[in-house]
Amino acid sequence: IGGGRRGVVSTACYVARIRGVRSAMPMFQALKLCPDAVIIKPRMEAYVDASRAIRAMMEELTPDIEPLSLDEAFMDLSGTARLHGAPPAVMLARLTRRMRKELGLTGSIGLSHNKFLAKVASDLDKPHGFSVIGRADTQSFLRDKPVRLIWGVGPAAQAALEQAGIRSFADLLRWDRRDLAARFGSTGDRLWHLARGEDNRRVSAHAPMKSISNETTFHEDTADPDLLDGHLWRMAEKVSDRAKAKDLSGRVVTLKLKRSDHSLLSRRISLRDATQLADTIYRSARGLFDQVGNEGPYRLLGCGLSDLQPAAEADRSGDLLDPAAVKRGQAERAADRIRARFGPDAILKGRSLR
């Protein structure tokens, strides 16, 4: 499932995966690996409807559900055996049967005593497996497994670990906790715990948002400064709109660029005050772009806001180096009120038309 040749793969069937096709892979690369693939356009409304139906089934088992995406979630079934008259394993088996019967969908279940192990177990036997990692079996199960099983250990992290002689959980277990932290920072301390099957994160139905971002892939690679500037402003507006809707602000602005050769370039700047203003987000991202220089052509441009905090902390002191910033902020708030009353196109900036 994916878009045109300049899009990316949303997901792939298991036959395509055998040939090397993966989610988020550029479509042109996927078609080289699997030239006879049938490309299906995404049907987001259908996926959202199915996700909501499955979520309703989950809520009949427990209120403690933490969604990860449309098709994946953590559930905490602690203490529910008496309520349902059956242990969690039985209730989860009934859930997957109900999904097949009512929705025609399969699901993979991973059951364990913490989130890390449940995630590992859910990936063991897709597309419709059921794997359990018991507390007593944790160490023996993990010992010979590769560290790439750890959620978040991608190719770059795996290469760094291999340079340190760490390829398996057994290798991790041989490292002293302080040595791991000294070499890999906070990630090293996390790895020390995960190597022992320890994960104290709770299932949270209201996990805080960590970042807000927007990006676009161009139909054709471009180095046109006006076109890039127009897109950057529109993305800053979208990020700002989402921050305002969530009553959030952020202290870190990130710029993301992907060149024609698919190499990624990312830059970020920390602001003195958190912001939710499109003008501040745009000017910060534009400054990062100017520092990079126009090394295009580019195939992708992105803008993001992170280190999120309540909007009450936003835009407090103004910018002493830019006295006009306060007036621009006031003008933006006024424009927001006009759009709220008359619609999103009631007032536009000229650069948004580029």
Region locations from a protein language model:
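Gly/Gly-Pro- and Ser/Thr-rich, intrinsically disordered tail segments characteristic of DNA damage-repair
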Residues: 1-193, 201-203, 241, 325-354
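Short, charged/polar surface micro-motifs in flexible loops or helix N-caps
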Residues: 5-7, 260-264, 308-311
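Short aromatic/hydrophobic contact patches that present stacked aromatics
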Residues: 38, 74, 254, 270, ...
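Short small-residue beta-strand/loop micro-motif enriched in glycine and branched aliphatics
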Residues: 38-39, 263-267, 313-314
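Short, hydrophobic beta-strand segments
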Residues: 73-79, 266-269, 316-321
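A short glycine-rich, hydrophobically flanked beta-strand micro-motif that places a catalytic Asp/Glu
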Residues: 107, 111, 250-253, 300-301
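DNA-contacting surface of Y-family translesion DNA polymerases
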Residues: 142, 149, 157-298
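Acidic, metal-coordinating catalytic segment for phosphate/diphosphate chemistry
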Residues: 158, 273-354
